[in-house]
Amino acid sequence: HLCAELPFARVNTGEYLGYSGKRRLIESHAVDVVNVHGSIGMSRDVARLAADYGIPVSLGNTIMEIGVHLAASLPECLFLEFSDLRWNELAVQPVEFHDGLAIAPDRPGHGIEFDRDKLAHYAAPGG
C-alpha cells in the first residue's frame, strides 16, 4: 500500500532479496522500481519479470565495468548505482562518466583489464 500512498515518491527496494522475494514484490505491485543486485543471470531474469509488469529496475553496485555492461543491456534499467571505490583504480581503463552517465566500453567481453602493477602493489603487505 506504500506505493499507492506515496504518489510523489518512487519506492525502490529489493536489493538484498533473492529471486523469489523480488518476484513477490513485483507480482504484488509493492514496488515502483526493483533494485536488482546479485548474479548477472538473476539480475536479467528479475529485469525481464519486472518488464512484464511495467516496472523499471535499478542496478545495485556491481563491480567495475560489469555493472555498466549489464545496465546497458537492460532497457528497463533506470539507474546504475556505482561507487567509485578503489577497485576502479585497478583497471587499465577505469569506468568513464560523461554528464553523470557511465559509458559502456566497446572492448570485447566484459571490458575489464587489470593493471598488474597495481594488483601487485595491493597484494604486497602494507599495500
What residue ranges belong to the model's regions?
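Active-site or pore-adjacent capping/gating segments
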Residues: 103-105, 114
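Active-site microenvironment of metallo-dependent hydrolases
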Residues: 120-127
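Low-complexity, compositionally biased segments
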Residues: 84, 118-120
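Shared catalytic-loop signature of beta/alpha-barrel
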Residues: 1-101, 108
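C-terminal beta-strand edge segments of enzyme domains
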Residues: 106-108, 118
